């Protein structure tokens, strides 16, 4: 499948949930993670708040920037035969080099935390000069992690590794592929999330522009984009990969003006269509949600 048209379905705001940065779908529910939030917000299939899952003991709703874990990426994985929500910190500071696991076979999972510093050190030694992990998905038996560049380091990366890499960080295999979007846009735009839909064999990538020259500071928000790669398993083995298509979200709906898309998830829709759910964090303390239909 190669999407021929993209239509805007709806948008809404989670005014009581801060800084949405990742979204994952499992068993009829959406799991939204905020980069400075103390809980995971669970939504039902109609995007209505269902419950929340605590992931931090910090007493306020938002964790201050210098100490926040900066959870920017999430993915559903099968670990030891159980569906498990994995949430990854950006690793842009020492406090952010961590990963959470939440088993989905219990009503209120207790998160288990793992450091990722050894794995991050190996990525730096392999030539990735700056780490800012922003997305994660599963393609077959591989974990794919998105690393975002910035205006001073204009490289995005897809890091391919194995489930459980956090348990054997010093030996876990990995490979790196750089997505090349130069055929679609001029200038640099940062990779903000990835989502693979096995039912359609499509990898979706979100990008956004932000006026910042490092992995820590926020900047003025520009345009956001969605790109896709069909049959990605065979296309991520080289040093670079090129999307099959890419669109600027402002052209889909004016609702995307001034929105910094941070996360996305893809689910199969009717008649071979695809439904995309996007989350936006505009550094204002709430979360934007958007729904698109691709046919």
Tell me what each language-model feature is:
Residues 1-295:
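Sequence/structural signature of beta-propeller domains
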